[in-house]
From Swiss-Prot:
Annotated gene: TPC1
Solcar repeat copies, ranges: 14-103, 110-195, 210-310
UniProt-recorded name of the protein: Mitochondrial thiamine pyrophosphate carrier 1
Lineage: superkingdom: Eukaryota
Function: Mitochondrial transporter that mediates uptake of thiamine pyrophosphate (ThPP) into mitochondria.
Keywords attached to this entry: Membrane, Mitochondrion, Mitochondrion inner membrane, Repeat, Transmembrane, Transmembrane helix, Transport
Location of this chain's protein in the cell: Mitochondrion inner membrane
Chain segments annotated as transmembrane: 14-30, 84-100, 116-136, 170-186, 217-233, 285-302
Membrane protein topology class: Multi-pass membrane protein
Record GO biological process: transmembrane transport
A Pfam cross-reference name: Mito_carr
Stated induction or repression of this protein's expression: Expression is regulated by carbon source, with very low expression with succinate, acetate, ethanol or pyruvate as carbon source.
């Protein structure tokens, strides 16, 4: 066993290609175990509220419908762009965090503020780089037919009908959301790690396990807090990504709802959802998201630190 290190805070000691590769590994690992939950979450976010049922029954209803009408493989629709999204996002997030950490360290910011700022910059960078894959994944997951959609055909359709902006629909809102998420996640993560480091020597021996548990849960706690705060913004972004789809009327029984979004920006769509569906609609899929956040964040940070440990041997 090796002693776990905080490679993010010590990123200036890690080569850029190692942080890039470790981030890709962590992203792919996280994606591989959460794809089905991700699909259900996106389906719930894309479906306007109509006599909302309890959160738990919503999840089961969507899952049963997918198995009955589309088959078990439906849970992995959009898996290719989803995997590319996670790999690209993971690589960009961790490598840019390490890079920004290196260049901002000389400014001598207070440790928690430093983590918050670096996390925000890392979030913006990773969002821009990976966003087209996010749009593709949302469009493919929205397909509720038995047959799968062609990725290349969807790319051509977006390019033909919407142009380059189509691949970045909702990206400004996404950068705001993801920047906030990254800031909260990394800020919480580093705050807990710093707290544990500072109290390690003064903590009584019989309470060491509590500190160790908190230390190992830092990434998960940060991910959960960030998800709860930013989930409504993510729901609005999903609606924006799907609203101009060529297959909107074919894949959704609520095309008129999406039609009412035409010409609206992020804030107006959010207000429209609040007015027509209520605040609970902005949290459709939150239980799935939180269930996904725990393994995703844990595997992401664990995978990154583990990969960095072994890459340092070479």
């Amino acid at each position: 066993m090796f002693k776990e290190e905080d490679s993010l805070r010590k990123g200036q000691n890690v080569a850029a290609w190692k942080t890039l590769l470790a981030g890709a590994v962590s992203g792919l690992l996280a994606r591989s175990i959460t794809a089905p939950m991700d699909t259900i979450k996106i389906r719930l976010q894309l479906t306007p509220a109509n006599g909302l049922k309890p959160f738990g029954s919503q999840v089961m209803e969507v899952a049963r419908s997918m198995i009955k009408n589309e088959g078990i493989r439906a849970f992995w629709k959009g898996n290719i762009p989803g995997s590319l999204l996670y790999v690209t996002y993971g690589s960009a997030q961790f490598s840019s965090y390490s890079l920004f950490n290196r260049y901002l360290t000389p400014f001598g910011l207070e440790a928690r503020l430093h983590s918050l700022v670096v996390g925000a910059f890392a979030g913006i960078t990773s969002s821009i780089v990976s966003y087209p894959f996010d749009v593709l994944r949302t469009r493919l997951v929205a397909n509720n037919q038995m047959h799968s959609m062609s990725i290349t055909r969807e790319v051509r359709d977006i390019w033909k009908l919407e142009g380059l902006p189509g691949f970045f629909k909702g990206s400004i809102a996404s950068m705001t959301t993801i920047t906030l998420t990254a800031s909260i996640m990394f800020g919480t993560y580093e705050t807990i790690r710093i707290y544990c480091d500072e109290n390690e020597k003064t903590t009584a021996a019989h309470k060491k396990w509590e500190l160790a548990t908190l230390n190992h849960s830092a990434g998960t706690i940060g991910g959960v807090i960030a998800k709860i705060i930013t989930f409504p913004l993510e729901t609005i972004r999903r609606r924006m990504q799907f609203m101009n789809s060529k297959h909107l009327e074919k894949f959704s029984r609520h095309s008129s709802v999406y039609g009412s979004y035409k010409g609206y920006g992020f804030a107006r769509i959010g207000l429209q959802i609040l007015k027509q569906e209520g605040v609970s609609s902005l949290y459709r899929g939150i239980l799935v998201a939180l269930s996904k956040t725990i393994p995703t964040t844990f595997v992401s940070f664990w995978g990154y630190e583990t990969a960095i440990h072994y890459l340092r041997m070479y």
